[in-house]
């Protein structure tokens, strides 16, 4: 484990390197069961971009930038990757946005990237409205604190991550066979399922369904880890036929 902020990370397991980028404000809370299963196959490097699990929760946090998270992830990989080897990468939610940007900026040593329900909703038809609805649905009248002794990772996410990250609109072309954009089976018909499908089509990736919903990593860690391992090590699953993204309202 290293406490060096802003590139804090934890390492467990053995095998090829797999970088995990958690969602929310990057705190890896709840990912233990998933990490434990993945560690049987990979050297799992869990990235903590703000150091929230490494003693910095409650300290002041600036407005976050996607590029800062992806560059931090790149530096972590440069530190932990053995010479000549490539890394597998998984990110969910805001972490999914960060790993897409990582692939756009530094594709050279990435074997395969899986981005799970990245909320790049501005790419959808009427994306500005959909983004505003998403923010309104998460941002209640009394959000949890982002600083001080009672600060929570959710408070940090709402105050400093949600708005800049949901404004991010990736526009690169992924190297063939090296990107999968995933959504939960329980998310069918919902905003982030549509977003994942559109991203896979636009970025030259494959689309895959994973167990559970947006929190499938927490809800079904065993099944999620098994499918993630298969997707990473065997390449992109069969891409579903492109479909028209719905707008509502």
Regions found by a protein language model. Give the residues of each.
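Conserved HGGG/HGGXW glycine-rich cap/lid loop of the alpha/beta-hydrolase fold
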Residues: 2-56
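Catalytic active-site module of serine/aspartate enzymes centered on a nucleophile-bearing elbow/loop
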Residues: 203-249
